[in-house]
Amino acid sequence: MANEYFKFKRFTVHQDKCAMKVGTDGTLLGAWAQAPQEPSRILDIGTGTGLIALMMAQRYPNASIVGIDIDPAAVAQARDNVTASPFADRISIYEADICHFYENDTFDSVICNPPFFTGDLICPDKQRAVARHTISLSYHDLISSAYKHLSANGRFSVIIPIESQSNFESEALMGGFYLSRLCRVKTTLVKKPKRCLIELRKLPVSESVNTCEVIEINPGIRSDWYKELTYDFYIR
């Protein structure tokens, strides 16, 4: 059973009401995604516990962050986590579907740790199924929504399973995006990449950055890359 809360250096994430708990994927994305300027407006789609919104607020002290989720329980929990954090005055959490979400202005950074199962058996737990499966948000809908809400010079960042990379990149290209950064992530040196961090932009880039990194060099021994990436967040 997952812990009811996860303590970071500057904030604590309670997660007992959320289907999806704090995990490596969300932490990776929250530490890797970029906002192109300060002050920035940042949109966290499917905020869940509010983890990524909190991480971006810590990394960008002058940014204002909006987190949205369709799950009322997750929204309530994210609001509680934000209220208890040092960043409460810069983060707003709303119950909303990104496909019908309306904002007067665009965002400099749009971030999403999207539902990632496309062909697996659907979990009988409705809350968990919505959080985990693309029945709630297809890549096509996510990409078109992100494009609509992203500023001209903004960045759209996601983390997806490596087996979905080709499909996601094709949808992104058809949706008007250009690939600017790509990082394939291995859990250990001997394993194949499991996840893929992707950054997209509306404007063409001269050359995209393509890397492959590893989380652990040996069991329980984090790589220098992962330690540096998450240094400001993990207590140990």
Segments and roles (model prediction):
Residues L29, N113, L142, L200:
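Residue-level signal for inorganic ion chemistry
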Residues R10, P39, N62, A88-R90, ...:
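A generic structural signal for alpha->beta connector loops
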Residues C18, V22, S136-P193:
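Conserved Class I SAM-dependent methyltransferase catalytic core
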Residues H14, V66, S92-Y94, S180-C183:
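General small-molecule cofactor/ligand-binding pocket signal
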Residues A2-R41, T47-T49, L54, Q58, ...:
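SAM-dependent Rossmann-like transferase core, predominantly class I methyltransferases
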Residues V190-R236:
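SAM/dcSAM-binding transferase cores
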Residues P114-D141:
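Mobile active-site "lid"/loop adjacent to the S-adenosyl-L-methionine
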Residues A31-N104, S109-C112, T118-C123:
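Conserved SAM/SAH cofactor-binding pocket of Class I
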